[in-house]
Amino acid sequence: MDINASLIVQMLVFVVFIGLTMKFIWPPLTKALEARRKNIADGLAAAEEGRKELELAEIKSKEQLTEAKTQAAHIIEQANQRANHIVEEAKNKAREEGAHLIQLAKNEIEQEYNAAKTELLKQISTIAVAGAQKILQREVDKASNDRLVDELVSEI
């Protein structure tokens, strides 16, 4: 194998090329590759952190939803209890008012009954007095007495 000057020059040029490449081209290239690797690693870490935050948010939202359902059920139960209480109060008040009205009606009926009874007694007294006057004005015999009593009874 013949080594000639052109092969040596080519080897020297190649070594210079490698040296220049290692000094000027390789460092920015490795920096760019390192920056890209770091950027990808940061992106993956951010994605993992985002996934964890999403899981935590889902858990928290489920807990809040469960708590909201519990509170809603509690509020509905309280509303039902309050409604039942109001209905019972209204029923009791209606019963009391009904009993009061019945008592007032009974009292009024009793007063009307007593007034009618008093009026009837007055009328009977008036008729009895009128009948007694007629009997005393006429001659007293059995037939006229029976006839006057029948008239009085028919008037009553």
Swiss-Prot record:
Places the protein is found: Cell inner membrane
Alphabetical list of Pfam families matching this protein: ATP-synt_B
Keyword Cell membrane: yes
Transmembrane domains' residue ranges: 7-27
Principal place of residence: membrane
Protein name: ATP synthase subunit b
Record key words, sorted: ATP synthesis, Cell inner membrane, Cell membrane, CF(0), Hydrogen ion transport, Ion transport, Membrane, Transmembrane, Transmembrane helix, Transport
Topological type in the membrane: Single-pass membrane protein
HAMAP family per record: ATP_synth_b_bprime
Family the entry assigns: Belongs to the ATPase B chain family.
Self-association and partners: F-type ATPases have 2 components, F(1) - the catalytic core - and F(0) - the membrane proton channel. F(1) has five subunits: alpha(3), beta(3), gamma(1), delta(1), epsilon(1). F(0) has three main subunits: a(1), b(2) and c(10-14). The alpha and beta chains form an alternating ring which encloses part of the gamma chain. F(1) is attached to F(0) by a central stalk formed by the gamma and epsilon chains, while a peripheral stalk is formed by the delta and b chains.
Biological function: F(1)F(0) ATP synthase produces ATP from ADP in the presence of a proton or sodium gradient. F-type ATPases consist of two structural domains, F(1) containing the extramembraneous catalytic core and F(0) containing the membrane proton channel, linked together by a central stalk and a peripheral stalk. During catalysis, ATP synthesis in the catalytic domain of F(1) is coupled via a rotary mechanism of the central stalk subunits to proton translocation. Component of the F(0) channel, it forms part of the peripheral stalk, linking F(1) to F(0).
GO-annotated cellular components: plasma membrane; proton-transporting ATP synthase complex
GO MF assignments: proton-transporting ATP synthase activity, rotational mechanism; proton-transporting ATPase activity, rotational mechanism
Native organism: Coxiella burnetii (strain Dugway 5J108-111)
InterPro entries, alphabetized: ATP_synth_B-like_membr_sf (IPR028987), ATP_synth_b/b'su_bac/chlpt (IPR002146), ATP_synth_F0_bsu_bac (IPR005864), ATP_synthase_B_chain (IPR050059)
Matching CDD domains: ATP-synt_Fo_b
Superkingdom field: Bacteria
